[in-house]
A protein has these predicted regions:
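Extended, charged/polar low-complexity intrinsically disordered regions
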Residues: 1-188
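Conserved ASCE/P-loop NTPase catalytic core
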Residues: 192-327, 331-334, 349, 470-496
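Conserved phosphate/pyrophosphate-binding and hydrolysis machinery centered on Walker-type P-loop NTPases
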Residues: 171, 175, 197-201, 369-372, ...
């Protein structure tokens, strides 16, 4: 049985062919999870006939119920003529204190001030977040005289799965190999696993960490077109993506409305992703935002207005790089493209993971999945539920990190390890080799942050961290290196990853002594000949994705 058939058998009614959303989306400005919510109702099968029939039904639903802004007046007329009509639209709710009622605004239909029942708001507090929630709404029209508001909300259902059986999901893990499970997650996020190596899959999975870990501080910078913001925009109704130009302290954290405090996005969403996180000409970042952000990233709380507020939302920063990695390592640093106001140690030290977006290939036609993956609102609900499962303590069974690491270093590594474990091994069953793969990845992604801090803020040089650990299963000391560190000759000012042992030092001394008499030697006839160095037999290991290696560099001297 192939892995795709395993998926269909294990998750009956919870899978969908991932290219179907593209077939129905067209130019609609609708997240994938909205479309797959509909596809999951009609196309959750591998039977071509059922899929084709379901596709037509979904297309009919979109045609008849999705509100295009250009057709808003026609839809209003339809509602008036028929008395009611079901629509798909993005709904935002505010409290009208004067009337003592909640009122809804419809993004595409163009209606505002529509009364909405308190029960809907209590069950779906994200309606109040100011960012809007995609919903299926039956909206009615009230005829007659002396009617203050003609429109009424008869039914409202947010487009997301209502409940899941988390234990059933975890139980199915045993039916898949690790490679099959990772590939299932790749298909689920809409990508073709056949176009990626294992490291690229890990980097892609890391984008899910903010969804599965509370208060996870994530950053990814890389070239354009590599899918950095895709997961945060399309995957989950529990996350929100905001453009860099629209980010304010009031919108993110809390705003004052008279004497009343209105919570911002972090109070309602699992993930708040800051897109286009890069320096923009002529635009300065509010100092209050930076201070509030730093406090939140460190303490999971923020002080605005009268009190202190706590939240569990993960913060994500994604943006484009301006130069190649070798250029940045040699001339600047790997944070060079972010807003200048954020290039300071106090902020960057709070980042748990720096994902190397430059290692992901630009997305092309064959990069997208045409296979079966879990329906996005189902996996989003699973990840949401897994946020309550803390696996950080498991790390201590495998590794003891050097005492030179700061508490923030330890916390970052623990949280990344915990999140990756929940994603790949939700049942907790993994081999030692698999566990140390997670340890190394987690430590590398934190070391990437720390290496750049030495360049940006020299005060970190006073107590440099040695990124190494004792493997508690073997007792062997292991060094941690970033891939760009081994691929490029331009290192951070402080690096303990390649400490030479006594044998290598002795070999170097011997080699130095061999060459101390000059570059040339004379034969018995007095003819000058170039000295041939004494070469040592050795073996070399290269990491997946490592660059800077050539045949000439390896073998020319031999």
């Amino acid at each position: 049985m192939d892995s795709q058939q395993k998926v269909l058998n294990a998750f009956i009614g919870k899978v969908v062919r991932k290219d179907l959303a593209f077939l129905v989306k067209g130019g609609l400005p609708v997240p994938t999870y909205v479309l797959e919510y509909l596809l999951g109702q009609y196309c959750a099968s591998d039977d071509e006939e059922i899929i084709n029939e379901g596709l037509e039904k979904v297309k009919d639903v979109i045609k008849n119920n999705y509100v295009h802004r250009a057709e808003a007046e026609s839809v209003k007329g339809l509602i008036r003529e028929h008395g009611k009509h079901r629509i798909i639209d993005k709904v935002t709710v505010v409290l009208n204190e004067k009337n003592d009622e909640y009122q809804a605004t419809f993004a595409n239909l163009g209606l505002s001030g529509v009364p909405i029942g308190t029960d809907y708001v209590r069950k779906n507090p994200k309606l109040l977040s100011g960012n809007g929630v995609w919903c299926i709404v039956t909206i009615g029209y009230i005829s007659g005289e002396d009617v203050k508001v003609r429109w009424e909300i008869q039914t409202l259902k947010p487009i997301q799965i209502s409940n899941i059986d988390l234990q059933e999901y975890i139980e199915q893990r045993k039916n898949f190999t690790t490679e099959e499970w990772i590939d299932l997650l790749m298909h689920t996020v809409g990508l073709n696993p056949d176009t990626m190596n294992r490291r690229e899959k890990f980097i892609t999975l890391a984008r899910l960490l903010p969804h599965v870990e509370n208060n996870f501080n994530f950053m990814e910078l890389g070239p354009k077109g590599t899918g950095k913001s895709h997961v945060f925009q399309e995957l989950s109704p529990y996350g929100v993506l905001v453009s860099g130009g629209d980010v304010t302290s009031a919108r993110l954290f809390v705003k004052m409305q008279g004497n009343k405090e209105i919570l911002g996005l972090v109070g309602y969403w699992d993930v708040v992703a800051w897109d286009e996180f890069e320096q923009q000409k002529g635009r300065a970042v509010d100092a209050v935002l930076i201070d509030t952000m730093q406090n939140y990233l460190a303490n999971k709380s923020f002080n605005r207005g009268k009190g202190t507020h706590e939240a569990s939302a993960s913060m994500v920063f994604v943006g484009n790089t301006k130069h190649t990695v070798p250029f940045m390592l040699k001339n600047t640093h790997l944070f060079e493209s972010i807003p200048t106001s954020f290039i300071k140690g106090a902020f960057l030290d709070r980042i748990h993971l720096y994902n190397p977006g430059w290692e992901i290939k630009m997305l092309k036609k064959d990069s997208f999945s045409k296979g079966y993956g879990l329906i996005t609102d189902y996996i989003a609900a699973v990840l949401h539920a897994l946020r309550n499962d803390d696996r950080t303590a498991v790390l201590k069974d495998y590794a003891k990190f050097d005492g030179s690491l700061s508490e923030r270093d330890h916390l970052a590594i623990r949280k990344t390890f915990s999140g990756m474990m929940k994603l790949i091994y939700p049942d907790g069953k993994m081999t030692d080799e698999e566990a140390y793969e997670l340890v190394d990845f987690a430590a590398e992604c934190r070391k990437r942050v720390k290496d750049q801090l030495y360049v940006i803020d020299e005060t970190f040089m006073a107590e440099p961290a040695r990124f190494k650990y004792i493997n508690l299963k073997t007792g062997i000391e292991m060094n941690v290196e970033t891939l760009e560190e081994v691929s490029n000759p331009f290192k951070s000012p402080v690096s303990f990853s390649k400490e030479e042992n006594a044998d290598s030092l002795q070999t170097n001394e011997e080699a130095s002594e061999d060459h101390s008499n000059g570059e040339n030697i004379s034969d018995s006839h007095g003819t000058k000949r170039p000295r041939i160095p004494i070469l040592q037999e050795k073996s070399m290991t290269f990491r997946m994705g490592q660059t800077g290696v050539s045949y000439e560099k390896l073998f020319a001297s031999y």
